[in-house]
Amino acid sequence: MDDYKDTLNLPKTLFSMRGNLSKKEPNILKSWNENNLYKLIRKKNQEKKIFFLHDGPPYANGNIHIGHAVNKILKDIIIKSKNMSGFDAPYIPSWDCHGLPIEQKVEEKIKSNQGEISTTEFQEKCRKYAQDQVEKQKKDFIRLGVIGDWDNPHLTMNFKNEANIIKTLSKIVQKKHLYQDFKPIHWCLKCASSLSEAEIEYSKKKSDSIIVGFKFKYRSIIEKLFDFQISNKKEIHLLIWTTTPWTLPSSKAISIHPDFQYQLIETERCYLIIAKELVEKTLNTLKIKKSIIRNYVKGRFLEKMICLHPFLKNIDLPVILGKHVTLESGTGAVHTAPDHGLEDYIISQKYNIKTSNIVNFKGEYISNTHDKLDGVNVLEANSIIIELLIKNNTFFHHESLIHSYPHCWRHKSPVIYRATPQWFIDIDQKQLRIKLLQEIKKVRWIPEWGESRIGEMIKKRPDWCISRQRKWGVPMSIFIHKNTRKIHPNTFVFMKKIAKKVELEGLQVWWNIDSKEILGEEYQSYEKILDILDVWFESGNTHTTINYKNKNYTKKNADMFLEGSDQHRGWFMSSLIISTLISEKKPYSEVLTHGFVVDGKGQKMSKSIGNTISPNEIVDTLGADILRLWVASSNYSNDISISNEILKSSSDIYRRIRNTARFMLANISDFDPKKNIISKENMVLLDKWAIGQTKIVQEEIIQHYNNYNFHAVIQRLMYFCSIEMGSFYLDIIKDRQYTLKKHSQERRSSQTAIYYIINSLVRWIAPILSFTADEIWSYLPENNSQYVFMEEWFDKLFYLDQDDLFNYQFWNEIITIKHEINKFLEEAIQNKTINNSLETSIILYVSHELSNKLKILEQETKFIFLTSDIQIKLYDTAPKNAKKSKIVPYLKVSLEKIKGKKCPRCWHYFNFTKKNIKNSDICNRCILNTIGNGEKRIFI
C-alpha cells in the first residue's frame, strides 16, 4: 500500500494546542509595553466618539484581592469592546491615596520616634507609602491584561487633584451648603475619628438587651394624672428597653409617643407604665403573672413629668414627646441620650436639652461620670451599668440579643454614635435631596434595582459629615471666627488662593501656611481649621477632573461608573451629591454594579475561614486569561462564586475556544488573502452559510457586549465553537480541506470562509481572552494593524440571501437532521454494528419537499453526514425497522454497513469491482484529486 500522506493538505501551525498562559502572557505584556499599545490605540481612535468609563479609585493599600480583579477585568472588557465598536474608549486608572489606613501603616513604621516627627514630615511619609502601594497594585493590574494609561494614573494625592478638591469645597461653601454642628455621628473607637455613611457596614452583633425603670419623682402628680390613689408605698416606674446600656449615663430624657395610650399597671413589686399595645409582651418578658391595670392616659399628658436617673444621683430627666417612638418592640418609651443617637439629638433640640459630652475620642467615660465608670471603655461598661441598676432597684430584665449593628468598614469593629463638633453638607438646603432623586431617574442602572436602592438611601440619609480629625488628607482649608464660630465671609476667595498654593506644593501647605498671609490683619480673630476631608469627598470629586485629563471630552458627565454593589452608599452617592451640588447634573450616564466574590459554597471570602483565593496565584498557575474568562462567564449582577472546580470549568471552556482557533489557523497555513480569496459568487454553498452564520453570531455577540452580558457572550461563543463550527461546519469541510487539490477553488473557498471566521472570532474574544487573542492575531496572515485591539469588528462578513433555496431555513433543517443521524450513528457504534460513520451506508426517508432539495445536492449529500454512501427515499417507502426521528417530522433512517474497499487516502469506502487507473488502490475521487483535474464541489 502506498503512503498518500504527501498528497494530502494536512493542517499545519505553530499555534500550540496548550495555552501555557502563565509562561506566554508575560512576553505578550512586554510587547504591549515596549510598543506602547495604549498610545497606539488612542492614536488610531483619536477622531472617534469618546466613551469614558470613569475608574472608581481603589484604596492604595495592600495587595489586590479577587474582588479587585473582578472589577478591573469587567472594566477592561467593556473598554476593549467599546474600542471594537468604533469608540475611542480611554482608560485612566485611579487610586484613593489619602485616609486612615495609610496613616496607621505609617504610624506602625515610626512608632519609636512618632513624637519627634512633624505633621508635614508625617504627611510626606504617607505620600511615599501610598506611592509605593500604587506601584505595587499597578503591576498586578497590568498583569491581568488591563490596558490603560498606567504612566499617567489619576491619584487623589497629585497636587493638582488635591487643589481641585479644595476648589470643589469652596463652591459648596459659596452655595452655603456647608455648616458646622455639634451632633452625634458614627465614631470608630479604633480610627478615633468620625465616619461617613459610606464607611459603615452592618454586621451581626451580640448585644445586651435590658429593661430599665425610671422612677417618677413626684408620685402625687402621677396619681392625679391617672386618677388613681396609691395607698401603698410602691414606686412608679416608666419602663424603657435598650440594647445600648452604656448610653444610660448620657441619658437626658425619656421619649414617649404623644398619641399612644400608656397604662398604669400594679404588680407585686411596683407600678409600671407601659404602652397599651406592648403591655402583654412586656409582662411576659418580665415573667409577671399577677398584675392589675389601674388606668391609662394618652402620652401627651405625661409630657414634662420628671423621672429620676436610674443610677446617677441628683439628676432629673423630663418626659418628652417624639413621634420616632414606635410599637414595634420595647415598652413604648425610650431613654434619650442626645450624644449617642441622631433621633435623640433631634428631639432633644426641640426641648433645648444639651448633650453631656462624657465620652472621649477613645470611647472612654471622662472623669466625674461615676466612680465605677470613669476611664472605662463604653463597649466594656454594660456589666458595670447592670450592677448599678440592680443596686438602685431599677433593673428589670436582661437577655442577649443578636441583631444588625453598624461596624467600621476598615476595622470590622462596632462603632458608636458620639456627639462632636463636625462639618456637614446640608442635604436638604435648596431642595438638594429632591434634585438628587430627580437626577438618578436620568441614569441607566444595571441591574435596574440599583435605582431604587440608591433612591431609598437618598431619602433616608442624614446630612453628610465630611470632616475628619486626622492628618493625611486634603485640608478643609477654612478659617472660623474664634468667638462666633462662623466661617470667614471671604472664604471662597481664600480657598482659591490656598488651592493655587496646594497645586504647587501639595496639601502640606495648609499646615505650614501663616494665617496672616491669607487673612491679613484679621488673622488674630480667626482660627485655622485643621480637620481634613472625608476620603469619600475626595473620591466623589474625581469626576470633576475628567475634562482636565481628556481635553477632547466635552460631556458634562462620564458615560459609566462600574463598581461593587456596596458603592451605592459610597462612591456613587458621594459623586452624585457633589456633581448635583456643583453642576446640578448627574456625574454618570450609566451605573453598573457587580456582586461580591464568594467561595464555591456561597460563603463570603475570609482569611479567618481560609477560603480566599489570590488572583496572583491564579495568574501564576493558570494564566490571566483563565481568570478573565471566569469573570466573563459569571453572572456578575449577583455574588460571584469561585473555586478550583469552577476555574477548571473555565479552563475547559478555554480549551474548546483555543482548539477551534487552532484548527482554523492550521487550515489556512498556506492561504494568502491577497491571492487566494474567493468571491462570494464563486464560493461553495456551505461556505457561504458558514460566513452568513458567523455574521448572525457576530451581531448577537456585539449586542451582548453592548448590554454588558458577558456571560451570554461566552455561552454564544461556546455554542458557535462546539456545535455550529465543531460538530458541523469544520467537521464537514475536513474532507474538502485535506483531499482536494491544494489550489482548487473549492478548497480556497473553505479557506476563505475560515479566514473570515477566525478574523471574526479573534475580535470576539479579544475583550475577554486578551492574551490569547493577541497570540492568534500574530499567526493570522495579512493583519491590518499591529494589534487586534486596534481593530473594529470584522466587516467582510455577509448574510445569505433569504430568497435562495439554500437559505438559513434550509441549513437549519440540515443541521437538525445531521444531529439526529449522529444519534443513530452513535447508537450503532456503541452496539458495535459499525466502527465509524464512513463505513456506513445511510438511507434517509423524507418528505417530497426535502427529498427534492437533497437530490439537488446529488452525491455531495454524503459529505454532510460524513458517510461513504447515502440514498434519499420518500418517507412512505420506509421499512418497518427504519428508525423514526422524535424531533424531525417525516424522517426515518436506516443504517447499513457499506460494502466495498476503504480508500487509504480519503478513508471513504468505494466499489472496487472496476479496475482503477494504473491498478491504484485509491478511489476514483482521490485519483481525480491527485493526478486528475480535481474534484468539483458546488454545495458541500
UniProtKB/Swiss-Prot annotation:
UniProt-listed CDD domains: Anticodon_Ia_Ile_BEm, IleRS_core
Gene Ontology terms describing biological process: isoleucyl-tRNA aminoacylation
'KMSKS' region (motif): residue ranges: 604-608
Cofactor(s), names only, from the UniProt record: Zn(2+)
Binding site for Zn(2+): C903, C906, C923, C926
EC number: 6.1.1.5
Cysteines paired by S-S bonds: none
Complex formation: Monomer.
Domain notes: IleRS has two distinct active sites: one for aminoacylation and one for editing. The misactivated valine is translocated from the active site to the editing site, which sterically excludes the correctly activated isoleucine. The single editing site contains two valyl binding pockets, one specific for each substrate (Val-AMP or Val-tRNA(Ile)).
Name of the protein this chain belongs to: Isoleucine--tRNA ligase
Species assigned in the record: Buchnera aphidicola subsp. Acyrthosiphon pisum (strain Tuc7)
Lineage: Bacteria, Pseudomonadati, Pseudomonadota, Gammaproteobacteria, Enterobacterales
